[in-house]
From Swiss-Prot:
GO terms for cellular component: cytosolic large ribosomal subunit
Region (Disordered): 1-26
Biased composition (Basic and acidic residues): 1-10
Protein name (database record): Large ribosomal subunit protein uL18
Record note on quaternary structure: Part of the 50S ribosomal subunit; part of the 5S rRNA/L5/L18/L25 subcomplex. Contacts the 5S and 23S rRNAs.
Stretches with biased composition (Basic residues): 11-20
Keywords (A to Z) from UniProt: Ribonucleoprotein, Ribosomal protein, RNA-binding, rRNA-binding
GO molecular function: 5S rRNA binding; structural constituent of ribosome
Entry keyword rRNA processing: no
Name of encoding gene: rplR
Organism: Cyanothece sp. (strain PCC 7425 / ATCC 29141)
Keyword DNA repair: no
Family: Belongs to the universal ribosomal protein uL18 family.
Length: 120
């Protein structure tokens, strides 16, 4: 039976979430990608608490970078989430791509976060 795109994404997401979990020492960097925007959260799964979040919908992000290239926006969100995480003392995370393929905007966010100082 062939799965459609949504079912394939859900299947990958369930498979990844079975293996990837965040702790207090090494929280999970979760990425959600919609058609126009990208969201990133650093989550402690044991406490069920979001420690840091950033998205392309934030007013300061929109005024600074405006509308346009979504891949460039992903790079900026990666840098922003890394800066906020490092400010809270979080250096090591576990990367959760949210069922999406590690390609394009998800990859751009991950590489920017690594360059900005996050380890995963």
């Amino acid at each position: 039976m062939k799965l459609n795109r949504v079912e394939s994404t859900r299947s990958r997401h369930r498979r990844v979430r079975r293996k990837v979990g965040g702790t207090g020492d090494r929280p999970r960097l979760a990425v959600f990608r919609s058609h126009q925007h990208i969201y990133a959260q650093v989550i402690d799964d044991q406490q069920q608490h979001t420690l840091v979040a950033a998205s392309s919908l934030e007013p300061e992000f929109k005024t600074q970078y405006g509308e346009g290239d979504t891949c460039a926006a992903s790079t900026q969100i990666g840098k922003l989430i890394a800066e906020r995480s490092l400010a809270k003392g979080i250096q090591k995370v576990v990367f959760d791509r949210g069922g999406k393929l590690y390609h394009g905007r998800v990859k751009a966010l991950a590489e920017a976060a690594r360059e900005a100082g996050l380890e995963f």
